[in-house]
Amino acid sequence: MMKHGKGEDVFKYIEKTNEKNLYRINKGLVPGMNVEGNMYVNEKLKLLIDEEIKMYQLNKSSTFLPAVIQIANVSTLPGIVKASIALPDVHAGYGFSIGNVAAFDMNNEKAVISPGGVGFDINCGVRLIRTNLFYNDIKDKQEELAQLLFNHIPVGVGSQGFILCNQNNLDDALSLGMDWSVKEGYSWIEDKLNCEDNGRSLYANSDYVSVRAKKRGITQMGTLGAGNHYAEIQIVDEIYDKKSAKLMGIEKKNQVCIMIHSGSRGLGHQIATDALIEMEKVMSKYKINVIDKQLACTPIHSPEGQNYLKAMGAACNFAWINRSSMTFLARQAFSKVFNQSPDDLDMHVIYDVSHNIAKIEEHFINGKVQNLLVHRKGSTRAFPPFHPLVPLDYQYCGQPILIGGTMGTYSYVLTGTEKAMENTFGSTCHGAGRALSRNKSRNSLSYSDVLSNLKEKNISIRVASPKLIMEEAPESYKNVSEVVQTCHDSGISNKAFRLRPVAVIKG
């Protein structure tokens, strides 16, 4: 693992371009860069990047790598095309930074797939459900709704779901994704139509999921988990693009929505762990030398690469079922409080997006269509109007992009653009991105102050683990509005509407 001796050695490779909010990470920052890095940050967010670099320089004995170095490291991987891309919410992660997009040429036999480019929580993502309710309808029931959602949706580390699976059921679920949810009565048919990939990965094969991974997943279907995962009752706070919002069923301020942020739980984590161990063992066979062992990888078309792709697809299906199951539970909770059916309450899924995934997609490179394996880690697909993979309902506005904020802050719905297709492989940000480590958050923030701040904003909170109050406080994250505005100003996504939370459920 390479280490720079002086701060200026890093900074001199970072160059501001003529394009708004775009910095270039030039070749030479680390040995063996195949392509440059492109980093989308405004001046305020750039200061956080600079602080990460300075911290790295001061602590020479640490194994910590700042996001800029990680972006450059990814550019050394075999088969990468165009650039290693950092989005405004970028921060240091495992191997790849969180907020990194990297695409690899499927026609290059040396091009690789890397579990670090997806993350441990495979298909961590966000779902947004609208209702025909407005804030006046729920303000006297806010605490009741918060408690009922907390009671209905299993939360926290090790939480167990209400869907009891046996081995055969789980194998079917891992293969079918949301088609399984529809078959079992947990989803409406329309739900999957407004879900990325219709809620089913065609790469999935449960035979490539280890017994240990299945054992971890079998009890966790329909569970929120912990960390930054949440279910929130939100209200529409601002509408920027009335036409796009209307296509999503949003016409007025104060309309009530539910946002669910969760992933593939222990099953996905185990699949990632299994793949990293396997790939570390065999890299020498393929003559792959990585600059950081956390970038363990194998050729896409190798047996190990294909095995991971199939297991990852199964984890994606599990995550879509997981969010579908919690949608079912949220619909039950609202139905119980308002004594109306979910259909009468217009509880339709607006969209469901992933922000930890690798997928084979077609993109134009140097004027030619190429099949690429696009790794998105802490980044969201952002396909434009009239793209064939955008649902029929959204052909005129582009794919909805769901950007979750932090506990007590705004969330956003954006739409995809042609410029994203040209510059970022059809990708944009995924959220706020951490600014403080979990440990620093626990040590520097006060439990009572964070709760008091939420109370002042009239936000109901239910949390299974009190330490999460500090870890997930708004002060622990970058300003999500800055992140979203940077993407909007850069043209890689457009703002449609903004939401603010009135009730937060966390693990």
Swiss-Prot record:
Pfam families referenced in this protein's UniProt entry, alphabetically: RtcB (PF01139)
UniProt keyword annotation of Ligase present: yes
Cofactor: Mn(2+)
Highest taxon listed in the record's lineage: Eukaryota
Reaction(s) catalysed by this chain's protein: a 3'-end 3'-phospho-ribonucleotide-RNA + a 5'-end dephospho-ribonucleoside-RNA + GTP = a ribonucleotidyl-ribonucleotide-RNA + GMP + diphosphate; a 3'-end 2',3'-cyclophospho-ribonucleotide-RNA + a 5'-end dephospho-ribonucleoside-RNA + GTP + H2O = a ribonucleotidyl-ribonucleotide-RNA + GMP + diphosphate + H(+)
Entry GO MF terms: GTP binding; metal ion binding; RNA ligase (ATP) activity; RNA ligase (GTP) activity
Misc. remarks from the entry: Ligation probably proceeds through 3 nucleotidyl transfer steps, with 2',3'-cyclic phosphate termini being hydrolyzed to 3'-P termini in a step that precedes 3'-P activation with GMP. In the first nucleotidyl transfer step, RTCB reacts with GTP to form a covalent RTCB-histidine-GMP intermediate with release of PPi; in the second step, the GMP moiety is transferred to the RNA 3'-P; in the third step, the 5'-OH from the opposite RNA strand attacks the activated 3'-P to form a 3',5'-phosphodiester bond and release GMP.
Function: Catalytic subunit of the tRNA-splicing ligase complex that acts by directly joining spliced tRNA halves to mature-sized tRNAs by incorporating the precursor-derived splice junction phosphate into the mature tRNA as a canonical 3',5'-phosphodiester. May act as an RNA ligase with broad substrate specificity, and may function toward other RNAs.
Family: Belongs to the RtcB family.
Protein name (database record): RNA-splicing ligase RtcB homolog
